[in-house]
Amino acid sequence: METAGAGTGQPASGLEAPGSADDRLFLVKGGIFLGTVAAAGMLAGFITTLSLAKKKSPEWFNKGSMATAALPESGSSLALRALGWGSLYAWCGVGVISFAVWKALGVHSMKDFRSKMQSIFPTIPKNSESAVEWEETLKSK
């Protein structure tokens, strides 16, 4: 019994095909890039919020870094717990939205997704002119 793609060099389904090495490399690079951007964004947001809180009221910031009888949990451990839950909710939310868009478009691979997005959104015109010369643009007159 032959599969639907036998003889044509095409697999019967997208699940059977391992994909080319270039496609896998593209996926890995894309995943690493998105993970790095997400981690950098989370870290920058957390550090910015922490520095603003310390700048606004340093005495309360220092008071919140140690657990007391009135507050059994220190402010920093509470903040780290909130960061953990917030990160979990953010990752799950983005995953659910991505999955919903993927299923709504009815695509089965990244190539299908790319072609579907290119058909939905307008094309970006390629400008044959050279890039803007910033030195001349920003030069004071």
UniProtKB/Swiss-Prot annotation:
Pfam family, one: DUF1358
GO biological process, one term: mitochondrial proton-transporting ATP synthase complex assembly
UniProt keywords, alphabetically: Acetylation, Membrane, Mitochondrion, Mitochondrion inner membrane, Transmembrane, Transmembrane helix
Mitochondrial matrix side stretches: 1-29, 103-141
PTM-bearing positions, type N-acetylmethionine: 1
Disulfide partners: none
InterPro entries: TMEM242 (IPR009792)
Compartments, as annotated in UniProt: Mitochondrion inner membrane
Mitochondrial intermembrane compartment residues: 51-81
Top-rank lineage group of the source organism: Eukaryota
Family, similarity comment: Belongs to the TMEM242 family.
Role played: Scaffold protein that participates in the c-ring assembly of mitochondrial ATP synthase (F(1)F(0) ATP synthase or complex V) by facilitating the membrane insertion and oligomer formation of the subunit c/ATP5MC3. Participates in the incorporation of the c-ring into vestigial complexes. Additionally influences the incorporation of subunits MT-ATP6, MT-ATP8, ATP5MJ, and ATP5MK in the ATP synthase.
Subunit structure: Interacts with the core subunits NDUFAF1, ECSIT and ACAD9 of the MCIA complex. Interacts with ATP5MC3, NDUFC2, TMEM70, MT-ND2 AND MT-ND3.
Protein name: Transmembrane protein 242
Organism for this UniProt entry: Pongo abelii (Sumatran orangutan)
